[in-house]
Structures are given as C-alpha cells and as structure tokens.
Amino acid sequence: MLENLVVDNFFDNPDEIRKIALSRYYRYGNDNRGRSGWRGERSFPIRSLDKVCPCCQQEVDADFYSEQKLLIEYSKKIFDMCKKHFDIGEFNEEYTVTAYFHIATEKTLDSMPFFDQSKFHQDTGPIAGVVYLTPDAPPNAGTSILYAEENRIVNVENKYNRLVAYNGHRIHALSDAFGTTRETGRLAYTFFIHSALDPLHYD
C-alpha cells in the first residue's frame, strides 16, 4: 500500500461544512452500544440519504436532506480518491465509506488514563482518514501514524481543510486535542472505508 494521501483545500466550501458540523447532534464514545468507544464526540454516521433522522426517528426536513446529500457526495469523492491512490487488490464494489463529524477537546485528554499511550489504535477497514475543520488549529494536533517496520511515527499537521487518508490497519491516533467547547475544539470529518457487509460496526 502506498504512503498516506494528503490533500489540502479538499472541501470547496469548508466554512459551510463546518457550520453543518456544529449544528449536528453528537454522541460520546461510551454511548455506542457497548462497543469500544471513540475518543471525544461523534455525530451519527453519514452514509445514506435517509428520510428519517437516526437520532430522533423523525422525518428530516429539506435543509437536513440537502446537507446530507452534499456530505455524501464528498464522501464518494473521498472513496474515489482513495481507490485511485491506494493499491488494494480487493478494493471493489463490496466496499463503502462511512463518515462522521468528530470533536475532541481538552476534556478528551482526560477521558482515559495514560491518554498519550491509550489513544493509539487500529481500525478494521483498509482505509481511514480525516479532513480537519478547525481554523487556525495547533499544527501539532493532527494525526500520528506508526510505521513499526521503520521504527518511526509520521505526524501529519492539522491544517484547516486538509484531508489525510492512511492505512487503517496501521496503529494511529489523533496527535493532540485542544479547545474547551465544540466551537473551539478539534473538529474533523472522519471517514472509514470498509466492507459494505459490515455497516453496523460503523454506527
């Protein structure tokens, strides 16, 4: 598999995407049906154009539907870019992409003991990544990816509207978190490319 994919200025309209993100409902990592939790807060999955809101089971309004359609179009763009960049033999129609908005603040750093060690993890799907959505974020609050065979860690800096995609099976983590509110915290559009036969794992 090739090295990480980094694309600056990914969203055509990052301010609009950020506004959508800050309007969404969020869940904490320990709210996801007993499965291992994520770090910080996440929106409900962005995967399909549903007429019913997953958080309240009410019919969505036209504005929400339009937002969801826009986000899914960007997710498809991410899928196509990753398919072109990464050399994965099994990367075919059996794979799909699930995305979320994800917020990590200073509170996230206290969410588990020894956070600097505990934050590192692997994903089940072949590709994962983020698009950073906090203007003027600390550069050192990006993404850290372990290359064990080379005994090194690659740190991708946090830059507004930068996309980074990487091998999800590599050990990785957010490099750091910051801010005290959703508006000032580390906001990202987080995505996973995974088997279409296993969507519930990404709820």
Q: Where are the predicted features?
A:
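Non-heme Fe(II)/2-oxoglutarate
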Residues: 1-118
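Catalytic core of non-heme Fe(II) oxygenases with the double-stranded beta-helix
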Residues: 105-203
